[in-house]
């Protein structure tokens, strides 16, 4: 069972340094549907979720937005017909932080129901 989604995020101001590669690899094992990518010089978690239509993709986007607002930690969201791409990373840490893995796990939970 994925315990990440039950963990608490820390405020971004306390985020500190980005995670080391070995810690990213360890946490990534708990999120097999997410990929680690580097874009614009920043390491991120990315996953594309699929839906049967735009309405369901938009509803999912809104649920992720509500989650992000509640935690004060915000992803990149790209909503298209039938799919939503979500990217998590921590600007203040300069890459991936444990918060990003926690939020990715919660995002996956929203999709799973």
From Swiss-Prot:
Keyword Lyase included in the entry's annotation: yes
Record keyword Chaperone present: no
UniProt catalytic activity: (4aS,6R)-4a-hydroxy-L-erythro-5,6,7,8-tetrahydrobiopterin = (6R)-L-erythro-6,7-dihydrobiopterin + H2O
InterPro entries: PCD_sf, Pterin-4-alpha-carb_dehyd, Pterin_deHydtase
Pfam families hit by this protein: Pterin_4a
GO terms classed as biological process: tetrahydrobiopterin biosynthetic process
GO MF term set: 4-alpha-hydroxytetrahydrobiopterin dehydratase activity
Enzyme Commission designation: 4.2.1.96
Enzyme class: lyase
Keywords on record: Lyase
Domain of life: Bacteria
HAMAP family: Pterin_4_alpha (MF_00434)
NCBIfam families for the chain: PRK00823.1-1 (NF002016)
UniProt record similarity statement: Belongs to the pterin-4-alpha-carbinolamine dehydratase family.
Name this protein carries in UniProt: Putative pterin-4-alpha-carbinolamine dehydratase
Protein's organism: Chlorobium limicola (strain DSM 245 / NBRC 103803 / 6330)
């Amino acid at each position: 069972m994925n315990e990440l989604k039950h963990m608490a995020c820390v405020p971004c101001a306390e985020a500190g340094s980005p995670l080391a590669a070995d810690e990213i690899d360890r946490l990534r094992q708990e999120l097999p549907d997410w990929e680690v990518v580097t874009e614009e010089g920043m390491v991120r978690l990315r996953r594309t979720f699929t839906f049967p239509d735009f309405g369901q993709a938009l509803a999912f986007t809104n649920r992720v937005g509500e989650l992000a607002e509640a935690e004060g930690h915000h992803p990149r969201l790209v909503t298209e017909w039938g799919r939503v791409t979500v990217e998590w990373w921590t600007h203040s840490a300069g890459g991936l932080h444990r918060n990003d893995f926690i939020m990715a796990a919660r995002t996956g939970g929203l999709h799973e129901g």
